[in-house]
Amino acid sequence: MRIAILSRNENLYSTMRLKQAGEERGHQIDVIDTLHCYMDITSNNPMIRYKGEELPQYDAVIPRIGASITFYGTAVVRQFEMMGTFCVNESVAISRSRDKLRSLQLLSRKGIGLPRTGFAHHPDNIQDVIKNVGGAPLVIKLLEGTQGIGVVLAETNKAAESVIEAFMGLKANIMVQEFIEEAKGADIRCFVVGNKVIAAMKRQAKEGEFRSNLHRGGSAQLVRLSKEERATAVNAAKVMGLNLCGVDILQSKNGPVVMEVNSSPGLEGIELATGKDVAGMIFDFIEKNAKPNSNRTRGKG
């Protein structure tokens, strides 16, 4: 099979592992810089050009779209879909997952466990929003933040008001969430491929930190999931319409709650923590499912 990986950096661990795993299976793998693709949007003859040449017809595309280029990246994926190419994650599913508020609303609609969350536009509503999520300590998040950036733990209501007012003064979109204290700075990353959790790791925040992201200095180890945690991760992926994703879960006193669904999860942490060939399992899925014109919109909203 001829397979394209959409990635801005061919030297990233995830990109290199995917290329290696694909080539070991006899596939031709091309790494394509998403931002260097440009589209010829013509009726009944969609085309993508790259560095002055028309791209060949691929059997499958693996999108590795960074958050900062979501708009352009999803347009490129959509163009591949119009050309009949199988895309591991569809453009609409990537767009859903990148909008944190939209994601939570869709998950909520399907009854999936979530931390209590508030969202408001006007400062007059701040105190009531804080009250509705249970008061401090609480977590304030920028909707556009990634890798733990733009996430603040407010330990008092007064501190929460000050942080929210500051963000609103900067015209930033934020949401306010209850702090799951019983999680003790740990979360679980479930790696879902084709409606199945293929690997999972527990990430622990470093001492004095509440964000468990590995980019923030957290550590990771293999974890055995409960049936409820496994079902929560798979259902969250289905709601988003993602064939491949990382679902981040906290263990709360009311059961597992979903914090985020990541449409472009990194492979390094999960492969090192679990010892599993995650890249190879992704190609297992592609080999079974990649057929021309087989993209079907999954999920709603």
Curated annotation (Swiss-Prot):
Gene3D superfamilies: 3.40.50.20, ATP-grasp fold, A domain, ATP-grasp fold, B domain
Pfam families: RimK, Rimk_N
Binding-site list for Mn(2+) 2: E260, N262
Disulfide bonds: none
Binding residue positions for Mn(2+) 1: D248, E260
Record-annotated ATP-grasp domain positions: 104-287
Residues the entry annotates as binding ATP: K141, E178, F179, D187, R211, S212, N213
GO biological process: protein modification process; SOS response; translation
EC number: 6.3.2.-
GO molecular function: ATP binding; metal ion binding; ribosomal S6-glutamic acid ligase activity
Requisite cofactors: Mg(2+); Mn(2+)
UniProt keyword annotations, A-Z: ATP-binding, Ligase, Magnesium, Manganese, Metal-binding, Nucleotide-binding, Protein biosynthesis
Binding site for Mg(2+) 1: D248, E260
Binding site for Mg(2+) 2: E260, N262
Uppermost EC category: ligase
Cofactor binding mode and count: Binds 2 magnesium or manganese ions per subunit.
ATP-binding listed as a keyword: yes
InterPro entries per UniProt: ATP-grasp (IPR011761), ATP-grasp_RimK-type (IPR013651), ATP_grasp_subdomain_1 (IPR013815), RimK (IPR023533), Rimk_N (IPR041107), Rp_bS6_RimK/Lys_biosynth_LsyX (IPR004666)
Repeat found in the keyword field: no
One Gene Ontology cellular component annotation held by this UniProt entry: cytoplasm
Similarity-based family: Belongs to the RimK family.
Protein name: Probable alpha-L-glutamate ligase
Organism name: Vibrio parahaemolyticus serotype O3:K6 (strain RIMD 2210633)
